[in-house]
Amino acid sequence: MISVNTHAVIDYVVGVLLILAPFLLGFANGGAAMWVPILLGAGILLYSLVTAYRYSVAKVIPLSVHLGLDAAGGLLLLVSPWLFGFAQLVWWPHVIVGLAELGVVMMTQRNRAAA
């Protein structure tokens, strides 16, 4: 299981990596392949800053809502190459990170004692 504190750290790391991925992996072409991870990464950083867990600046969003956003983002990232039609250009980073995001959601401890 992943503690809530570890999940918080993972959120910030994944958010930054998603923003940088198109530039580091060579698909910063201005299309959906580039913008989907950038926007999802920025979203992760923003809602992580206001989630009710350690390492946030305001405790506004409950963990359950945060995990729902993570799951939705992971699923969108996973299917985005086919949904937005760029699978012929690049698909593996989106699929790998999408699956990892879903796995982190499933393995995160949800009880407050685990925080």
Predicted feature locations:
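Membrane-helix boundary connector in multi-pass membrane proteins
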Residues: 79-93
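Membrane-water interface at the C-terminal end of transmembrane alpha helices
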Residues: 4, 84, 101-115
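Hydrophobic alpha-helical membrane segments
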Residues: 65-80
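A loop-to-helix transmembrane entry motif
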Residues: 7-10, 28-40
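Juxtamembrane loop-transmembrane helix junctions in multi-pass integral membrane proteins
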Residues: 2-5, 28-32, 54-64, 85-88
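Membrane-helix boundary elements
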Residues: 12-32
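A low-complexity, Ser/Thr/Gly/Pro-enriched, surface-exposed linker/loop concept
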Residues: 33-66, 103, 107-112
